Amino acid sequence: MKVNLRNRSVFGFVIPDMVKGPWADIASGIRQTAQRDGHGVCVPLCWDNPAAVLRHPSVFARLCAEAGIDGVFLRAFPDRKDTRRVLSALRREKIPVALLRVNDESPICGAGFDVVTLRSEGRVLSRVALRLGSVACHALLQRLAKPRNPPADLVLE
């Protein structure tokens, strides 16, 4: 069963600590902005169990493709190898990925991936996370809808 809606995109999240804390606020900001501005809908993928994605990244990517997911917002996993495996699996299925990170955590080098850096100082992150999510959504939904060659890093301050 496909989840695509007419003339709207469907985006997925894979964010390990999305249930609470600043990342939950960032995800909420992206979701609210996407729905409010008519870009599309955002759905959590493996909300409570990101380890399932790591166990079978190619199966996860295939399921995303079959479900009609148009793009994925991914927070880097603690182990860079795990992040690369998931990125590569999604790329094989031709699903655009936006890799989210705060400041300089988990730097990933990989041609063809959009890396979005959300700049913030310490505790400020939890207060401005919703706004950062909103700004990230505007920038990323445009880039996921119309990929540029080559993708470049986007820094939001």
Feature names for model-found ranges:
Residues 2-116:
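Alpha-helical recognition/docking segments in bacterial nutrient-uptake
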Residues 109-157:
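Flexible loop/turn connectors
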